[in-house]
């Protein structure tokens, strides 16, 4: 089975072709990603209008390159998959509309993929893992712990009640004057800092649920930074190191609870799986190794290039769905918000969370 995947939910324009064998083994034939960092850097963050226009300008060429690198023509495709949300609606419209056009012209099945499901299923492409497994999904817009029990079968065990982890990293970078994109800059600065200098809180630590909260920690960083009369590069490194250490410790605590909840509902997970752009952070990857070791479970993390947004994960999610006969019509709609767990509700006492609703 050959599937073209298209990703345009944020600031990466991407397309890929994957091959899925009858036994479920996947192979990436091409995976082209064009980052829009340069376009958004002057503004210190992603500008939705600029992102959408860039997708319009870039996508046709990216798809053409992906097809040529894979060495196939459109007539050979068994399906076309596009991320239909959640994401910036302008970009989602561009990608889904393009996929519909290709599917219509070439009489090829269409799959409208949930971007979060694509992250959730990537470890099955890279490592061939069987269900069920416990997913830690962390990105600029989402932070969730999810039980993955099958294609289209997800139970959210925990979520953020305010900022996503990636969002918190970006906001801390911005308040400290670090360039965009902020996450890698904070990680880089933290490497030369003293993580013990600032005693930041460990949000939600010790709670019986598996939810996250980052807004208070972000405020604590701002307060400490404002107390420094003339902030130096070393001060920034120390602030970043202390912030990152707090995130790592809080994340480990939340994951320990999430794994306990998983075992209570589904038995022992086959693995703890990390996905999403934040999982490319080397310090977080190290912390996840510690959590998995203590939990006596396998840790699976796709290569960093497949943790951040890419077309291969969309193509693979499309292939997984096609293998089960799951396709979509031309009436498939783009969505700015799209729950991975359709039955999930907002954590008690918090109303609607910002990430995931």
UniProtKB/Swiss-Prot annotation:
Gene3D superfamilies attached to this UniProt entry: 3.30.420.40
UniProt-annotated binding residues for substrate: 137-141, 170, 183, 281
UniProt-listed Enzyme Commission number(s): 2.3.1.234
One GO cellular component term: cytoplasm
SUPFAM superfamilies, A to Z: Actin-like ATPase domain
Keywords attached to this entry: Acyltransferase, Cytoplasm, Iron, Metal-binding, Transferase, tRNA processing
Compartment list: Cytoplasm
Example GO molecular function: N(6)-L-threonylcarbamoyladenine synthase activity
Binding site for Fe cation: 115, 119, 309
InterPro entries: ATPase_NBD, Gcp-like_dom, KAE1/TsaD, Peptidase_M22_CS, TsaD
Alphabetical list of PROSITE patterns matching this protein: GLYCOPROTEASE
Cofactor(s) for this UniProt protein: Fe(2+)
A GO BP entry: tRNA threonylcarbamoyladenosine modification
Family statement: Belongs to the KAE1 / TsaD family.
Protein name (record): tRNA N6-adenosine threonylcarbamoyltransferase
Organism: Bradyrhizobium diazoefficiens (strain JCM 10833 / BCRC 13528 / IAM 13628 / NBRC 14792 / USDA 110)
Gene coding for it: tsaD
